């Protein structure tokens, strides 16, 4: 003690012979503020702690379970000891707030004290397991006139007793609540094998109703081993030594649910309503056990509860029902007792008999999840309980469906497998509802086999001692059990089937790392094998591909593409985008031609012009022939030869950069046949125009020069014709020229799967000369033969459908479109929709300029009357009224605007390389253009060529591109945006020139596409910053030095070139540059001069260098600017 009458925690623990943590725990429970073992408390607080610890020690003595002794006077019930009744509570069942599951690792050698708390339910830890042989003698001397009571020992907490009258109606039985201490392990420290329970005044008796207490028996205490609940190691069986006719006394651990939805906990004492224990045959049941209600087993007692889910325990035959068990309420087992509560979820134990009624068999322990499901079904399926009970009786037959009792968690594994308990069929008790849910439990388990968890057997540390105390309880006498009790073999096979069914629900094992690596290696190997075959042609979408995409299209590894680019001086990664020129260069290296995706789509025929209604009125129509080939191979000359011989003289045949549509007549087999020819440009910029020509054609004439062979546009034309699925007729031109080799052309075409007929193929090849007009008639005959095979037909009696071949804006006529009628007849005044353009035919002229009123199938005409210039390649169709056509045009215009916006955004596309350039130079340079051309095809050709220009450092941005003349509106747009106006084969509107001069707008006009593209490239290069290049001026040798003031002058002799004042110089000594700077002073004979030429002497001075030495070499140079190019 200290001076201030304070006590330290460690002093108090030393006085009480306890540890510091026990004192700290007690202080915490008493709300005494202490921090550590060195904290001080007052004397009053120390007394409180002592009282609490003494109370705990007394509780521990009460809680310790003694081994029952053979004395008869161990327990004497005091008649005056009356305990309040814990009865069922009206209303909803109380919930258990305790979520902890407790497990006893040590045997309980003393009876447990149960703490009774109203409105709260404590789950038991472990059911009591009795030795039936030791307890049978104790059940014979009970006084039947004594009051029934159940003895509860004190817990470490005080008891609160709440007596509530029982419920009269047993329809929904409420729950009897018996709480137990939270931590029994903390209270069990003694392992004594035989102690008597003190018969003190601290004992509490829990009785039933007062009127029943007077008539119920009081247990005797002489030699009653049933008075002490005892835990044994395992649910094993042994013979009863006092009854020779009983060959199986089986202890059984039954899991009992206290309330709906609450999991059962092991280690609880027997409570009111607990089933009679197995193995007590021929025992009188009129003797109550300590701490239990003694109820007589009168099945006709009014109002007795039938507890659902509690199967009767086996082996309780011929047992009087006036005796209870120790540790439980001794009550009369009268099922018809009025007002007795019926507790849901409490199954009757199997094997017990009421009025010689058979039990329903042993059931497996119920898991909490299964119990919840059972209670839900009990609430929702009251009308099917009888049917469920019948199923249960059928399932649990004694011969086929025997079930083994579940092992207790702390069970010690025995050396021999105990035989299994037989089942006996039982009928429903009279006057009681069938609350048994065994069938439902079996159905749930069969329905959800994957939810069955393997039971874990936990071996307690004192299980060995418990087994030894039972004197060989588990081992030696099992062999004398009847062999009929063993589980049938059929059940084992069914169990194995059920195990197999549960395995089917298991998920597949995850793929291991080794398996995944092996699978990936096989996939890579298969991909490499697939990539060994090179494609004939690759299609490039939107003019760009990444390196990885290009490698996939070429069936190569990406490393091969990167290596190829590296040798060309281009550093690229697999995700970097490549422009069309680079793609073509790489593809050409691997021998694969390149075709743009939009061009491929443009060549495909999208609309079938003949409908099902036209089949009755079809007639033959003239074929449409498209002349295709490489530039300068003689396409236009060939067509001119055909037209000059078939068309009236004097017709102008200006075939330049447009599609020319012409119709000629040819006499074949004494009949005049009409042929419609479309001439397409051969320049590479007009790919889209060639594709449109192929789209509407019936026969493709491929012109190949005999002296030049197959060229890139030749291969492109072949791909277009194949995309359109039209037959190809090859005209080998220029056979009259020196060096012509038609056989070489046939060889090259055969490599492209175009094999001549004389070589065994099916491709018609005609050698012709357009200049000398050789074999022209033969070519036309072959075209007619091929077209007849195609069986070309159309219906002239319907409204017209066709394709826009070309369109342009005429200064006098307005929008003009060249239309090719493919089905029906086009008439003046028809309302048509061409793409997103509405038109009403005001006039039509043929290729000769003659006005016509109607045009039949395969007839090309120029039509006037469109609201704006239609897009070349769009299909047109005539509609009955303007309202219908306008509605269709409105929908198409919305889509056209979205497409145009996407194209404008694409024109400003910035690649990875251009972004790096922008980061280095500080700003991305742009060249703004406004493009106006004569026809739509020229606009498309120019835009396609601009896309192929290098855009790494300068981005070309086309603000406006349209056919027609240059207007003042275009000038205003150019002035606002700083753009250059490009005009191709067009003119300026009135006032446009004056507006351009006023706003200082640059207008460039061109007639040839080569010059236009060249000037645009020069303009882009002009935006680049020039490079500084070093230019050498001359050399001089230092022959003398002169000291002037603080510096020095070098006397030099000019060897080559000249020296200029303020130029840059480099001083070299012993082949090493020792100084580089500016030439500040240059003198000759003491006079300052601007330059000194070869062979003269001069004096050279530098402000920053004065250590001249004879023999030094001075190199003079200057920096000049050099224009950069886009290719660098």
From Swiss-Prot:
Record-level Gene Ontology MF annotations: GTP binding; GTPase activity; translation initiation factor activity
Q: Which InterPro entries match?
A: EF-G-like_DII, IF2_II, IF2_N, P-loop_NTPase, Small_GTP-bd, T_Tr_GTP-bd_dom, TF_IF2_bacterial-like, TIF_IF2
Q: Which CDD domains does this one have?
A: IF2_eIF5B, IF2_mtIF2_II, mtIF2_IVc
Give the residue ranges for region: G1. Answer: 629-636
Instruction: Outline the extent of the tr-type G domain.
Output: 620-792
Where does it localize? Cytoplasm
Ranges of compositional bias, category Low complexity: 100-110, 182-196
Record's compositionally biased regions (Basic and acidic residues): 70-83, 147-158, 201-214, 432-445
Q: What domain of life?
A: Bacteria
- Composition bias, kind Polar residues: at what positions? 120-146, 243-267, 386-397
Cite the record's Basic residues compositional bias ranges. 499-519
Positions of the UniProt region annotated as G5? 769-771
Matching Gene3D superfamilies: 1.10.10.2480, P-loop containing nucleotide triphosphate hydrolases, Translation factors, Translation initiation factor IF- 2, domain 3
Q: Where is this region: Disordered?
A: 57-519
Region named G4: 733-736
Any one cellular-component term (Gene Ontology) = cytosol
Q: What does this protein do?
A: One of the essential components for the initiation of protein synthesis. Protects formylmethionyl-tRNA from spontaneous hydrolysis and promotes its binding to the 30S ribosomal subunits. Also involved in the hydrolysis of GTP during the formation of the 70S ribosomal complex.
HAMAP family in the cross-refs: IF_2_B
Q: Which family does it belong to?
A: Belongs to the TRAFAC class translation factor GTPase superfamily. Classic translation factor GTPase family. IF-2 subfamily.
Tell me the protein's name: Translation initiation factor IF-2
- Species of provenance: Prochlorococcus marinus (strain MIT 9312)
Lineage of origin: Bacteria, Bacillati, Cyanobacteriota, Cyanophyceae, Synechococcales
